[in-house]
Amino acid sequence: MDKSESTSAGRNRRRRLRRGSRSASSSSDANFRVLSQQLSRLNKTLAAGRPTINHPTFVGSERCKPGYTFTSITLRPPKIDRESYYGKRLLLPDSVMEYDKKLVSRIQIRVNPLPKFDSTVWVTVRKVSASSDLSVAAISAMFADGASPVLVYQYAASGVQANNKLLYDLSAMRADIGDMRKYAVLVYSKDDTLETDELVLHVDVEHQRIPTSGVLPV
């Protein structure tokens, strides 16, 4: 074989090697694209269940309706004697109340017992007249008429009873933020005196988004 043939054979070998290298690279690129597509689909699936500014998580477990968010307030009942009652109107922050025509879809109450809690309480949320003074007699009658759901919360050795939430759906009533002044959270201490530092009630009001809802609620 003369020098020109040797040079030609060397070039052919290099071409074959380069073609093989390009083929391996193309295969790797294709695999990478497939993997990227799979990861993208997985990310979209996971993202669908995440809270976002437009679709926050309602009460830590269920997402708000599209276009809705929620405002939370905290109530700490004072001492309630055995077989006596406590009532507190829902007073949302002024920054929320100024959008009084925004619709409210649901109210959720979460009962959070403090370490010394050892009682049984009944909890409900009711629409009450503007003239009601939320006296013991008035609250007693509202618990007795069966017009709204009641959560019976009892002492649990674990510290938190599994069923510690009450959901009140207002969608059919077309209630709005302005109407929240007409609603009250009511508590009945059934068997024991409820001390001031025994119970905390977290009230979450799900309503249409307002301009002040610039961050996810906590």
From Swiss-Prot:
Compartmental location: Virion
GO CC entries: ribonucleoprotein complex; T=3 icosahedral viral capsid; viral nucleocapsid
Record's compositionally biased regions (Basic residues): 11-21
GO molecular function: RNA binding; structural molecule activity
Residue positions, PTM N-acetylmethionine: M1
Cystine connections: none
InterPro entries (alphabetical): Cucumovirus_coat, Cucumovirus_coat_Asu_sf
Biased composition (Low complexity): 1-10
Region Disordered: start-end pairs: 1-30
Keywords attached to this entry: Acetylation, Capsid protein, Ribonucleoprotein, RNA-binding, T=3 icosahedral capsid protein, Viral nucleoprotein, Virion
Assigned protein family: Belongs to the cucumovirus capsid protein family.
Entry remark concerning the domains of this protein: The N-terminal arginine-rich stretch does not seem to be the major RNA-binding region that allows formation of an infectious ribonucleoprotein complex.
Function summary: Capsid protein. Probably binds RNA and plays a role in packaging.
Protein name: Capsid protein
Phylogenetic lineage: Viruses, Riboviria, Orthornavirae, Kitrinoviricota, Alsuviricetes
